[in-house]
């Protein structure tokens, strides 16, 4: 099992801590079988990450995005996600709706072996301008996080 601390903000990442966004890019590019993402906010300022997901879909990677239906309403993102779902049968977008709770997680799991868990939304603030902290975990904990995301898919 491997654990690495990630962050955003120049004062945080200058001390050898890797940035959240470059690590997200890296794990998406390295995905071979599956990507699961749960996120509270997804905006067009993170469109490049959606492009990376499109590249992964072209490689045959199964992708599941679980989005908070109340906060993920960016039109440009919606059009791109609709295109991905229509173009690739192995891409699934779940607009999480619950009368009791909101989806507030910010999690990515790749191949059930690598997970990024943190505070950063898929937005300009989350990737660049806010101070965010996250962890990259590899091994069994990533598998456990994937199982939680599987359960979230069933709740909706």
Positions of the model-derived regions?
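PLD/PLD-like phosphodiesterase catalytic module centered on the HKD motif
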Residues: 1-25, 30, 43-156
């Amino acid at each position: 099992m491997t654990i690495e601390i990630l962050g955003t903000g120049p004062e945080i990442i200058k001390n050898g801590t890797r940035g959240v966004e470059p690590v997200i890019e890296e794990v998406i590019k390295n995905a071979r079988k599956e990507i699961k993402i749960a996120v509270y906010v997804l905006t067009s300022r993170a469109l490049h990450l959606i492009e990376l997901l499109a590249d992964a879909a072209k490689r045959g990677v199964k992708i599941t995005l679980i989005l908070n239906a109340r906060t993920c309403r960016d039109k440009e993102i919606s059009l791109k996600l609709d295109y991905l779902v229509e173009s690739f049968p192995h891409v699934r977008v779940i607009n999480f709706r619950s009368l009791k709770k909101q989806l507030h997680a910010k999690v990515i799991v790749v191949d059930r072996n690598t997970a990024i868990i943190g505070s950063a939304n898929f937005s300009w603030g989350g990737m660049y301008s806010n101070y965010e902290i996250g962890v990259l975990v590899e091994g069994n904990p990533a598998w456990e996080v994937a199982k939680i995301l599987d359960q979230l898919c069933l709740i909706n």
